[in-house]
Amino acid sequence: MYRSCVVRARKRTCVEPWVIGIISFLSLIVLAVCIGLTVHYVRYNHRRTYNYYSTLSFTSDKLYSEFGREASKNFTEMSQRIETMVKHAFHKSPLRGQLVKAHIIKFSKEDDGVLAHMLLIFRIRSTEDPETVHKIIEYVLHEKLKYATGPPNVDPESVKIKKINKTESDNYFNHCCGTRRNKSTVQTSVRIVGGTPVEEEEWPWQSSLRWDGSHRCGATLINNTWLVTAAHCFRTHKDPSRWSATFGATLQPRKLTTGIRRIIVHEKYKYPSHDYDIALAELSKPVPCTNAVHKVCLPDANHEFQPGQRMFVTGFGALKNDGFTQNNLRQVQVDYIDTQTCNQPQSYNGAITPRMLCAGFLKGEKDACQGDSGGPLVTADVRDIWYLAGVVSWGDECGQPNKPGVYTRVTAFRHWIASNTGI
């Protein structure tokens, strides 16, 4: 049996105007409160960057000559110790979590010790009074460093800080070797062979060497007047006046262009051998240090890399064997491969000399390629400072299994570089 559907007429209800008014009023109050809370939250949590230049005196059981040279192993160790002391001081302070970076830029000798020059960068709520912030920073450094355990032994009373602007802060950073201001893609594993372009300012020491205006090789800026590159780049093209160097993440447009005054090819390089494949190019004029253009660090001659250590190689080279030069700079993450492994019969069968190093993967795929020659292979230390480990030299095609990229080992030529450039 079907049930019939009963339809009842709805009684229309009228709402009094005063009720509508109350509802509208309450809605406006709720909306105003929400807007106020949002504005307060944004304003309270908006942070302003504070840059400071700081100095502090310290004494050490090491001689200044042992750690005073930028980028040396002892310089890195001393810098890390002092930076760690400063970070710990702020960790137990009202500014906990607001110190973004403490970075030693240099040491200078004093009569009764050593002066550390340091940059401090904070991200602090914009509601805080700048004068109050300055006083808190001074107080923390003066009081908390009293409890820092050395070595080195810092003098908290010697601490001085000076507020500087972003331009000044960038200028200090850019005169330090191996610093990178833009690192948005450093964690990605992309390839030069089939990879994606990097962003401007990511690898500021990368240079393009051009013969009559056309890209021929990569190179690496090691100070404002010298490039390191591969000797084979100049095998048939030796006239410095026809060479130029450009900087930036694209071949066109160029960020900066300068001429080449002098080329120094290692005296033991003899083609077709790949040994001693290193050269220096002196720029016709010093290049200014900016976020987009500045030098990499050079490792000590006795520095040793560890198997599996992460490195990056960059260049404008081809995406595949016998391919074309790319307009955009590319990067690839590779691993350091020890010489014994690289000299196995299935790899290079003893061809790797003490002046070479291998980096890549035995499974292939990720590698440098034609047009990348002379470019940098770099690795970072514990302070996130980047060092030139190798110079793109040679390999068996590009990205082939058991045929990793072969690079000129920079540590093997550290004294040669110093004798020719003073660096």
Swiss-Prot record:
EC code: 3.4.21.-
Domain Peptidase S1: 192-422
Paired cysteines (S-S): 176-297, 217-233, 342-358, 369-398
Enzyme class: hydrolase
GO BP term, example: proteolysis
A Pfam family annotated for this UniProt entry: SEA
Tissues expressing this chain: Expressed in epidermal, oral and male reproductive tissues.
Annotated InterPro entries: Pept_S1A_HAT/DESC1, Peptidase_S1_PA, Peptidase_S1_PA_chymotrypsin, Peptidase_S1A, SEA_dom, SEA_dom_sf, Trypsin_dom, TRYPSIN_HIS
GO cellular component, one term: plasma membrane
Transmembrane segments: 19-39
Locations listed in the record: Cell membrane
Regulation: Inhibited by SERPINA5.
The SEA domain, residue ranges: 48-166
Key words, A-Z: Cell membrane, Disulfide bond, Glycoprotein, Hydrolase, Membrane, Protease, Secreted, Serine protease, Signal-anchor, Transmembrane, Transmembrane helix, Zymogen
Coiled-coil parts of chain: none
Subunit text: Forms a heterodimer with SERPINA5 and SERPINE1.
Family: Belongs to the peptidase S1 family.
Name of the protein this chain belongs to: Transmembrane protease serine 11E
Organism this protein belongs to: Mus musculus
